[in-house]
Amino acid sequence: MFKSTLPIAAAISVALTSMVLPAKALAANEAKTNQFWWPDQLSLSPLRQHGAESNPYGEQFNYAKEFASLDLAMLKKDIQTTLTDSKSWWPADWGHYGPLMIRMAWHSAGVYRVHDGRGGASGGQQRFAPLNSWPDNVNLDKARRLLWPVKQKYGRKISWADLMVLSGNVALESMGFKTFGFAGGRTDDWEPDLVYWGPETAMLSDKRRDKKGKLKGPLAAVEMGLIYVNPEGPHGKPDPLLAANDIRMSFGRMAMNDEEIVALLAGGHTLGKAHGAKKPNGCVGAEPAAADIEAQGLGWKNKCGTGVGADTISSGLEGAWTVTPTQWSSNYLDNLMNFNWVLTKSPAGAKQWIPDNKAAANLVPDAHIPNKRHAPIMFTTDIALKEDPQFRKIVERFRADPTQFDLAFAKAWFKLTHRDMGPRARYVGAEVPSEVLMWQDPIPAINYQLITDKDIKQLKKQITNSGLTTSELVRTAWAAASSHRVTDMRGGANGARINLEPQNSWAVNNPKELGKVLAKLEGIQARFNKKSAKTKVSLADVIVLGGATAIENAAAKAGNRITVPFSPGRADASQAQTNVKSFNYLKPKADGFRNFYTDDSYSSPAEMLVDKANSLGLNVPEMTVLIGGMRALDANYDASSYGVLTNNPGVLTNDFFVNLLDMKTVWSKDKSNAGIYIGHDRASGTEKWQATPVDLIFGSSSELRAIAEVYASDDADKKFINDFTKAWVKVMQLDRFDLK
């Protein structure tokens, strides 16, 4: 388908640095990327990140196994000891680092977004720029340094990604809250993730909305450098109702509903305080990424007063929300609803709210100075919970039943910190909760014997004789498996959700053809299962086996006998186990492997292909060989001939590469069909092929052409088939966490 007053947050950002690369940083001897000279050139960098060679523990390192061997109780005890061991270089508020650790964990997980699954706690990306230097993460570098002795003690058995989240849990528990549970298993990354965080070139700026004020693309935060929303209100305007709109939009794009939003904001602001002791100008130094080398990775050095403790400057807002900032309670809800709140400014100049009742002026103990007390405060985003009618109903319900509030926060916190981990099969540790939650995309446990090699041969024969074509079987298997995203480990063939709403209605899956194919595969499944009381096969397995069978037959037609590796063990989910709205976020706007592209795609067809390959965890050669194989197998989503550069569609050959690189063909734009190119015989002018930008990029991009040449060579036949098969199986097994 080719068709007014500067907000305090902004002031702090300017005071710290604009985060725009200074000219002097472009050293004379610094290599410039090709994109520097040719901005429109396709970047393949996303497919080259996080290689096994970047992991100092080595390619064979099994973190889940290491974590499983950990003494979790002892680790939690060590974290708890750290929470109350106040250090002079960063004194703890009220002698307790708990609120700081909660903020660290929250901001680590809170960059997750549902539209592309990127962000989240996995990988421990908060250690790296840009996240470690975002204005909203100011002074969280200290939280990680406080935890370093714990990380140092346990080494490879606890990742930073897990440690940050676990420390947030321990902090909550140490302050009297009962958490829902904790799952380990988040591996660490060793380099910054290449993520599109927005179009802006300066921190705390906003150029990411459409004319209606909605966020564009996959973005979730409302400004560059924020985790969610501006606490002072949209663009610093202290309007609670406008803030409510931003909150609902931003948190919604991070997979949270209204109840979860209220629970998280109220629960998070029950503990701790904001820091804005002084105006940042002239006080606060550069963020970690811009700090001098002797700072050793720490940033935001404050030269005013002691620079720490009572003189701390973080967000610029100042104060605590409750009278017990280190003890869990429902006081936040009471304060929010009981007081009439009036607008004021913090010592740093940030817009915030205090009670109009002077009797409230001494309710909150100072975090560092004995016998000094303050009024509680609220952000504009807090007042939004009171002013927005829907949020207010939830606040009143929680206030009337604090136990309901506690459970709602516990579950919302667990979801926040585990959303990007994928299904429960990836959870590790003694504190994994037993309750199965809908957002975990549950799949039933297998309670039957799996099919044997003999059964597989029998099923392959039935599939071959079913009347289904190679293209139909390949398209169906790909549609099922390629819904997986390695970004948040959602989707995939397991569960056979390709047979359920919403996936069976997606245009990219060609619903009419899909229904026909699945009906025949279900018939094969039913006949097999009827024969045996103990041995069963799932539809999910039959779908993947159908793709394998088709590829074997297509290779045989080219004179190559191969066996596509197949591992049974997938199960079938039900419609009741499938949240339609949630799964619709997996709906592809483009899938270059099937030559599918929509007008509301975030970027060009070639860029969307790279994005899709990245979400499948593919490298450049894997992406390349899969494109060649899918075109040879005639697997375009709509059965079109675009890019099917072969006279033998449905036969697994390297014809796509051979014909694409053939100098006897000259390409030109199709004047009557935007986005389509026509390949003519250079000598006669006869039309030979039609193709899309996704097809032609493998001859146009010098990097992709280099790989295409490998597969177009006369000696590439076996290599092409072997590499295609290996890459195909990789995609089919992306969600088979039981095999890893």
From Swiss-Prot:
It holds the Pfam family peroxidase. There is a cross-link at W106-Y228 (Tryptophyl-tyrosyl-methioninium (Trp-Tyr) (with M-254)). Its EC number is 1.11.1.21. Its cofactor is heme b. SUPFAM superfamilies: Heme-dependent peroxidases. Residues 1-27 form the signal peptide. It comes from Colwellia psychrerythraea (strain 34H / ATCC BAA-681) (Vibrio psychroerythus). GO terms for molecular function: catalase activity; heme binding; metal ion binding. Heme b binds at H269. There is a cross-link at Y228-M254 (Tryptophyl-tyrosyl-methioninium (Tyr-Met) (with W-106)). The active site is at H107 (proton acceptor). Binds 1 heme b (iron(II)-protoporphyrin IX) group per dimer. One of its GO terms (biological process) is cellular response to hydrogen peroxide. One of its GO terms (cellular component) is cytosol. This is Catalase-peroxidase. InterPro entries: Catalase_peroxidase, Haem_peroxidase, Haem_peroxidase_sf, Peroxidases_AS. Bifunctional enzyme with both catalase and broad-spectrum peroxidase activity. Homodimer or homotetramer. It comes from the Bacteria. Gene3D superfamilies: 1.10.520.10, Peroxidase, domain 2. Keywords: Heme, Hydrogen peroxide, Iron, Metal-binding, Oxidoreductase, Peroxidase, Signal. It catalyses: H2O2 + AH2 = A + 2 H2O; 2 H2O2 = O2 + 2 H2O. Formation of the three residue Trp-Tyr-Met cross-link is important for the catalase, but not the peroxidase activity of the enzyme. The record marks R103 as: Transition state stabilizer.
